[in-house]
């Protein structure tokens, strides 16, 4: 009723499918309140193009949307996995001056450099100095924390310029602490929370118009009858995997 879909008090609303309601990978699903939570894929959008619209791409779109990115900004994205790259692609829609993406995994940084040469890449151990050298305002104007580690949470506020926006979309295994005495003079704005599905129709429109393309993230494809091998590959991050698409079972 108020647009805060994630905080819906109805037991069948909000975080329902795959969360409170089991069966996120079932053959058939019944979608409660489908007029709000279900979006038709346009005819000109393939299944592979639409695959991430309801999850990691929606997260990236939401992160960029609430981060108040302006032309001329330097945007730092912490995490070069699928969600980080989706955040990067959606940040590009706002035409910032520069995007920097940070990750400890050389393979993921190489993935970004090979496909998005205008994006700067750096590892966490050199991030703070690198961001300052490549930001006209002495730090990132916007930081999107997507990695979810203790180090990335600390880097988020350390690499931000005074009065920057720090958007936290990551999930953490442990509680994080804001060292307010160390941050006192930076006057940072923190935004955080879980993404909803309210922008899915707009995301699909952008895909249909060629403004968003996440198909490069699909590095591996498995039939449904080999899904256990797909899970093993993804969990162990072998063979440069980013995302795995599952197709109908092969006979």
Predicted regions and their residues:
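A general structural signal for well-ordered alpha-helical segments in protein cores
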Residues: 5, 26, 38, 57-60, ...
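Conserved acidic E/D residue at the C-terminus of a beta-strand in Rossmann-like folds
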Residues: 103, 170, 194
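Glycine-rich phosphate/adenylate-binding loop and adjacent beta-alpha elements
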Residues: 1-38
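Glycine-rich cofactor phosphate-binding loops and adjacent beta1-alpha1 units
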Residues: 67-68, 92, 97-100, 109-189, ...
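C-terminal hydrophobic helical "lid"/dimerization subdomain
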Residues: 154-158, 197-251
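Short, well-ordered beta-strand micro-motif
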Residues: 30, 40, 245-247
């Amino acid at each position: 009723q108020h647009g805060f879909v994630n905080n819906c008090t109805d037991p069948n609303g909000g975080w329902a499918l795959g969360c409170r309601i089991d069966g996120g990978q079932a053959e058939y699903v019944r979608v409660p309140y489908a007029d709000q939570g279900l979006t038709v894929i346009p005819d000109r959008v393939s299944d592979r193009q639409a695959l991430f619209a309801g999850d990691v791409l929606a997260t990236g779109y939401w992160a960029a949307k609430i981060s108040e990115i302006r032309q001329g900004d330097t945007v730092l994205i912490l995490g070069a996995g699928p969600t980080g790259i989706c955040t990067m692609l959606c940040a590009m829609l706002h035409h910032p001056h520069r995007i920097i993406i940070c990750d400890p995994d050389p393979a993921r940084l190489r993935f970004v450099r090979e496909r998005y040469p205008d994006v700067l890449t750096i590892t966490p151990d050199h991030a703070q100095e690198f961001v300052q050298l490549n930001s006209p305002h002495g730090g990132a104007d916007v930081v999107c924390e997507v990695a979810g580690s203790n180090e990335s949470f600390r880097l988020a506020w350390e690499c931000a310029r005074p009065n920057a926006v720090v958007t936290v979309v990551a999930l953490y295994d442990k509680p994080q602490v804001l060292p307010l005495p160390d941050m006192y003079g930076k006057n940072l704005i923190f935004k955080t929370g879980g993404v909803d599905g309210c922008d899915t129709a707009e995301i699909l429109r952008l895909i249909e118009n060629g403004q968003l393309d996440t198909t490069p993230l699909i590095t591996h494809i498995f039939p449904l009858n080999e899904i256990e091998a797909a899970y093993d590959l993804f969990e162990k991050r072998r063979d440069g995997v980013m995302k795995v698409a599952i197709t109908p079972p092969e006979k």
